[in-house]
């Protein structure tokens, strides 16, 4: 009887880097999806991401999810 090999699952992280656009000035910058600190726009200073203990609440527009 042949031995069956089970497929080994490799765990993938659920967090990603996200390219966000500031709604005020249009600046695009890369933020972390599970940010632990308040993320502000580097140009105008508007808050783009607020930490919630898990995934950050995004106040800017998501342009692209980087993998």
From Swiss-Prot:
Q: Which UniProt keywords apply?
A: Metal-binding, Ribonucleoprotein, Ribosomal protein, Zinc, Zinc-finger
| Organism superkingdom | Archaea
Cofactor(s) named in the record? Zn(2+)
Q: Which Pfam families match?
A: Ribosomal_S27e
Which InterPro entries does the record match to this protein? Ribosomal_eS27, Ribosomal_eS27_Zn-bd_dom_sf, Ribosomal_zn-bd
Name the GO terms of the biological process aspect.
Answer: ribosomal small subunit assembly; translation
GO molecular-function annotation terms? RNA binding; structural constituent of ribosome; zinc ion binding
UniProt zinc finger (C4-type) residues: 22-44
- Matching PROSITE patterns: RIBOSOMAL_S27E
Residues that bind Zn(2+), according to the entry? 22, 25, 41, 44
Cofactor: how and how many bound: Binds 1 zinc ion per subunit.
What GO cellular component entries does it have? Answer: cytosolic small ribosomal subunit
Please verify whether the record's keywords include Zinc-finger. yes
Question: Quaternary structure?
Answer: Part of the 30S ribosomal subunit.
HAMAP family listed in its UniProt record: Ribosomal_eS27
Question: What name does UniProt use for this protein?
Answer: Small ribosomal subunit protein eS27
What species is this protein from? Answer: Pyrobaculum aerophilum (strain ATCC 51768 / DSM 7523 / JCM 9630 / CIP 104966 / NBRC 100827 / IM2)
**Which taxonomic lineage does the organism of this UniProt entry have?**
Archaea, Thermoproteota, Thermoprotei, Thermoproteales, Thermoproteaceae
